[in-house]
Amino acid sequence: MWRGCVSRGLRSLSKGKGSSSSAPVSAAARLFSTASSSYTVVDHSYDAVVVGAGGAGLRAAIGLSEHGFNTACITKLFPTRSHTVAAQGGINAALGNMTEDDWRWHMYDTVKGSDWLGDQDSIQYMCREAPKAVIELENYGLPFSRTEDGKIYQRAFGGQSLDFGKGGQAYRCACAADRTGHAMLHTLYGQAMKHNTQFFVEYFALDLIMDSEGTCQGVIALNMEDGTLHRFRATNTILATGGYGRAYFSATSAHTCTGDGNAMVARAGLPLQDLEFVQFHPTGIYGAGCLITEGSRGEGGILRNSEGERFMERYAPTAKDLASRDVVSRSMTMEIREGRGVGPLKDHIYLHLNHLPPEVLKERLPGISETAAIFAGVDVTKEPIPVLPTVHYNMGGIPTNYHGEVVTMKGDNPDSVVPGLMAAGEAACASVHGANRLGANSLLDIVVFGRACANRVAETAKPGEKQKPLQKSAGEKTIAWLDKLRNANGSLPTSKIRLNMQRVMQNNAAVFRTQETLEEGCKLITKAWESYHDVKISDRSLIWNSDLIETIELENLLINACITMHSAEARKESRGAHAREDFTKRDDEQWMKHSLGYWENEKVRLAYRPVHMNTLDSEVESFPPKARVY
């Protein structure tokens, strides 16, 4: 293939002088030439560069600008179109507005939800910071739903308890009706506009710029509007590029969720962590994949099978429909397998909201009522919604510590910090979610760790610090690869390779997995990667070339998919979202460790690093592993 990693070897390119009429005044432009084309390359220098403008990227950019850092935010789509906008249910924080609460109880639930694969120092940091993060959002102007006495309304959510699991259901999820992500994204974008962050909208980040010592010096990106290439030099680069849900055929993710940051890191020779843990949300609309928030069950919604039975009472006697997501998804899948599915093909389940008062639906779940009417054709006040477990979230990603700094294995040190590189949000793996994320912890994750990245930069750097110059050849290999890809003349269109990859992932790395399906999946996903060598691009232009962009995104997805499948095949246990039918028990002795997947010479190499069982300080003791029952 044209590129296996950033260090791919290509002949040196001739360089000439040139300028770009669209380049900012402060940027220097020149031409890079390949055998077939010349490319305008514009150089920029910033204290910090954020890649991605969803919740994590915006919160990082806001923090950096507040600390006085000259900050650029690169995003492939307009900030308010980022996938954070699709988050519905809410954001967890132990505010105690509905019942007594404590961040330590929240931490216990998160550790238990992670099936003891989460790093307890990072989880402590997130849960302790949560109330502060929510109050900060309120001060920014986020229009939270309210109780009658004016406090932020908090609803019940899955896997949440009081008093370390002994005190019943917690009401911890602060929400803005069922459009919390939408409210958050617009609120954060408004805040970012107040500060001096420079946005580069519709710029597609292609690769990290790494020096010979393994320090990240920035990124190279394509301006999709005019076809110019841009090298962003920065002391600190923060990746907030989201997940890779579109590697699957049916997903709640937007079509833009293609794991771009993950793939950039993998090509730079750094590992991706715990990619085998893919969350299936229990309630995607049957046939459409659109999300029905867990908040619908938090407000009293009930799952029923073809016999009208509330079957979750059998699988999770205490939590019932509000067990954690992996438990509910597996339970639904088992009901369908055993012939108790609904519909003509008996291949889905009903979510009943029709017993709830219409005023509750109107006030607390207005978006769900609308979504169900459009995509399922049902009136939720009278009929159940047809639902099916659907790919929703990637627990794995770029390994980081609780400061947001990217870490890698270096000699005997499993926590070696990669200088100049950070990550936050779904792209990162801190790991606060471990093997299974609790609902409403993702919006918390993005604001807490977006802010943590900015604070860490403020601790370790000063605005305006002198930077090491880029090598003249920095980014040349990426440009040569882009040129080759743009002129690719194989026999397979991007859409055909992508569909094949999505079907392999859907069939072979699903809710339940076996050695047979995973071994077959490894072979098939490798073939899908090999077929990418034969891709055909019809549009040769550089301006608004969706064919080219989708092909780059496909490469990024394929890298994520290959590492996911191989990591899943290697893990011989069931833990959280990784459910093996041939290894049905959790094996703490052999497998309480993080998987690391390296992308080397177009093949996956696996390694492992320990889970952090330690807490940050004496405020809370670590929670030892025990059976996970809801």
Swiss-Prot record:
Record's subunit section: Component of complex II composed of eight subunits in plants: four classical SDH subunits SDH1, SDH2, SDH3 and SDH4 (a flavoprotein (FP), an iron-sulfur protein (IP), and a cytochrome b composed of a large and a small subunit.), as well as four subunits unknown in mitochondria from bacteria and heterotrophic eukaryotes.
Catalytic activity, as annotated: a quinone + succinate = fumarate + a quinol
Q: Does the keyword Membrane apply?
A: yes
List residues binding FAD.
Answer: 52-57, 75-90, 260, 426, 442-443
**Protein's organism:** Oryza sativa subsp. japonica
Single biological process term from Gene Ontology: mitochondrial electron transport, succinate to ubiquinone
What InterPro entries does the record point to?
FAD-dep_OxRdtase_2_FAD-bd, FAD/NAD-bd_sf, FRD_SDH_FAD_BS, Fum_R/Succ_DH_flav-like_C_sf, Fum_Rdtase/Succ_DH_flav-like_C, SdhA/FrdA/AprA, Succ_DH/fumarate_Rdtase_cat_sf, Succ_DH_flav_su_fwd
Q: Which family does it belong to?
A: Belongs to the FAD-dependent oxidoreductase 2 family. FRD/SDH subfamily.
Q: Which gene encodes it?
A: SDH1
Write down what this protein is called.
Answer: Succinate dehydrogenase [ubiquinone] flavoprotein subunit, mitochondrial
